[in-house]
């Protein structure tokens, strides 16, 4: 029996809680952290534990300005709990831990473990070492020790899964610290990726999202410029895989073969999230983004020609150093031309260690706020107009879990359309489970969701729904002390603090 196993036997079942901040990469890493801890004998704390678990892990983000304040505020909240509970441990990982390795324990000496983005597999060992040695363990690897997809994973969903195809980023955007923290791009072999997808489908997963910091640069390791489009097409040949998505691509690497693969692969969903960041050529140059407005709008035009019903979303940064009113108007121009379904908008924030932080002509906060509000108002209007075009359409939805905050009160359920729009629909008499597919007619549009208020036209029970039911039944059958039961459909579970775009793609 390992020392970790012995500690669990001696002290009884120990619980854990993982708190996630940042992008989808962190969400997937948190699934691995949960898998590692459960593999080591820990069990998940009940929802709403709020720091009452025996081990609390923070998986942090370093992109936004308030990331530091958020972390240390949460750590301060846990300090009295830890002081009153011998044996409780706190671990900090992710991008902020990679960046602030030397200061976290100084500012919060009650933290037990600090680990980085390259060695998440060490967490159980570091926790045990901190317990035995009774001192903080700070261990940051400078490069990837093993591709994280080899680690055990506790997936949050029984019917949808992330699949990493690469880690790291070779771009040098002046506002972004991620490449310094996640390292250079490293690609997985196509055979390993497809084997993981096939294994997930065998478990009942029917939707996968191919994940990378710059997903369509995939293949740079092997010198194959069309590797990503080939991977998309290969996913189209996997029986039982109904939906394939990917995030996030970079406009520089968005080639015609990728557009063709999206259009011609039956299970590739009509959805594209492609960060814009700015519509101004001078600002894009200062950002070191390696494309210009004409190139970006040209990609949008080609995608819409090949996939007319595609929903296109983006990331935009407002108030980059040196941004003039004319520059900002160019961003508004692109937003009007592209007609994004949604835009994840961010106010520029200085990140120490990035070239942009040292640039002259930092924009006053009041100016940034005013521009931000104008951009949000414009995009809100466009999002609503684009959603109104969906009214009257008949759509197949994959029933989702925890997507609708008011589902229980309104007797509705929620699902995702092929283009990833959120749809709330009337709960049918027939039982439906997350992962099942329903056919509905859209009757109403709001800026951020659609409604299907009539009767459901069809219900298709799926292997994904079977997988959800099997896991839910197994979780509810666990002993009461473990408390791992999943919420029932229609009742939302707390979601990690995640932005669909983090401004770093």
From Swiss-Prot:
GO cellular component terms, semicolon-separated: cytosol
Requisite cofactors: [4Fe-4S] cluster
Keyword Nucleotide-binding found: no
InterPro entries in alphabetical order: Elp3/MiaA/NifB-like_rSAM, Methylthiotransferase, Methylthiotransferase_CS, Methylthiotransferase_N, Methylthiotransferase_N_sf, MiaB_methiolase, rSAM, rSAM_horseshoe
Chain ranges of the Radical SAM core domain: 155-386
Keywords (A to Z) from UniProt: 4Fe-4S, Cytoplasm, Iron, Iron-sulfur, Metal-binding, S-adenosyl-L-methionine, Transferase, tRNA processing
Family: Belongs to the methylthiotransferase family. MiaB subfamily.
Described purpose of this protein according to its UniProt entry: Catalyzes the methylthiolation of N6-(dimethylallyl)adenosine (i(6)A), leading to the formation of 2-methylthio-N6-(dimethylallyl)adenosine (ms(2)i(6)A) at position 37 in tRNAs that read codons beginning with uridine.
Entry protein name: tRNA-2-methylthio-N(6)-dimethylallyladenosine synthase
Organism: Streptomyces coelicolor (strain ATCC BAA-471 / A3(2) / M145)
